[in-house]
């Protein structure tokens, strides 16, 4: 773990590569089909990544910072086995041993760009770090910090259990949002020790939450997700929570 903290970074923009299907003619729309490739040079070897065009704000920001040299000399400051490796903290440049890292930023955030379920947290996914929902309910991304998914392989039954949990979480989130709108009323009831009133309100809000949840489709992993998570692996519980804006194409190992 300590050795991984010393992985120095340099990110170079390699250029754009067109992705045509066999037999497809090149035309004026070709510019929209090019994918930017970057090389992340580390003290343990090079990693080549491509950036998705469907997440233009994240793509352009990443390219901008790379060209400015912002990432040069930074560290992979957070390395968690079977989960991910995180980098991009400007405070990690020349950081002394033992310094707490992870809070550095560039003074701005990027609006979330979820292209889900097309892009998800399979092994090798390049994603943007962000602050938690309690201070960042819109899930905006850090302006500079990113992570690469290492993850682990899951079996079908585990993924099924995760689907069930995500659907239960949806109901809980709806209930909490409804309760938040009644906080003044709840506070008054608590202050007055009105247990019956609190119980009745809870039942009312829970019924509303169930009704609202029933209007939304149940969550299920796609065939592509199941195939990836049961073979190469990943971190499925992050799907739809963090912006995936690219992927590793070489150097993952």
Regions found by a protein language model. Give the residues of each.
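Cyclophilin-like peptidyl-prolyl cis-trans isomerases
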Residues: 20-253
């Amino acid at each position: 773990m300590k050795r991984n903290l010393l992985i120095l970074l340099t990110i170079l923009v390699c250029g754009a590569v067109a992705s045509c299907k066999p037999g497809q003619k090149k035309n004026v729309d070709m510019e929209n089909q090019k994918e930017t490739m970057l090389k992340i040079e580390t003290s343990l070897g090079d990693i080549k990544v491509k950036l998705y065009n469907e997440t233009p704000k994240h793509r352009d920001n990443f390219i901008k910072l790379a060209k400015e040299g912002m990432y040069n000399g930074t560290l992979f400051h957070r390395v968690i086995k079977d989960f991910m490796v995180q980098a991009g903290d400007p405070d990690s440049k020349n950081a002394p041993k033992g310094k707490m890292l992870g809070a550095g930023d560039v003074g701005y955030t990027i609006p979330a760009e979820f292209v889900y379920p097309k892009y998800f947290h399979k092994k090798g996914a390049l994603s943007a770090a962000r602050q938690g929902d309690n201070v960042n309910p819109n899930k905006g991304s850090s302006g500079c910090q990113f992570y690469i998914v290492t993850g682990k392989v899951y079996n079908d039954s585990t993924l099924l259990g995760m689907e069930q949990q995500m659907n239960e979480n949806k109901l809980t989130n709806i209930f909490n949002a409804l309760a938040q709108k009644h906080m003044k009323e709840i506070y008054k009831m608590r202050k007055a020790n009105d247990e019956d009133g609190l119980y009745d309100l809870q039942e009312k809000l829970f019924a509303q939450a169930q009704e609202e949840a029933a209007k939304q489709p149940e969550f299920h992993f796609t065939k592509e997700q199941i195939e990836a998570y049961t073979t190469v692996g990943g971190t499925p519980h992050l799907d739809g929570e963090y912006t995936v804006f690219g992927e590793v194409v070489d150097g993952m190992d």
